Amino acid sequence: MEATSTRTPQEVFQHHAEVLVAGDIDGIVSDYADDAIFITPSGILRGKDGVRKAFEGLLGDLPNADWEVPTTLFEDDVLLIEWKATAAKTKAEDGIDTFVFRDGLIRVQTVRYTLTPVD
């Protein structure tokens, strides 16, 4: 992988999506700044340890999920996505995240989704 400071926000997000689908927590965490801020309706998590905790929860909620990202809107170093994920027993159909990128890493992310049982 190229040096993080030379990656565009689009390249960072592409890598982020690949490692998320693979369930690679270390790969996910590597895309975040040391001082990252991760905001959810449940609270604010900080740093790489906070990011790790957040994604352990997300991947625990949606293990081995099929992911869809129908909307990606970039503006400079900011991204908004809408997403869906379906696992064997649970799904999220209303996921929405925002990202702020800095120096080839994710500096801030907000996440919101509703977990429901699969019909």
For each of these PLM feature ranges, what is it?
Residues 1-3, 18, 39, 52-119:
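A beta-strand edge to alpha-helix "cap/lid" segment located at domain peripheries
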Residues 1-30, 34:
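Short, low-complexity N-terminal intrinsically disordered segments enriched in polar/charged residues
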Residues 47:
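Short, conserved phosphate/pyrophosphate- and ester-handling motifs at nucleotide-, phospho-/glycolipid
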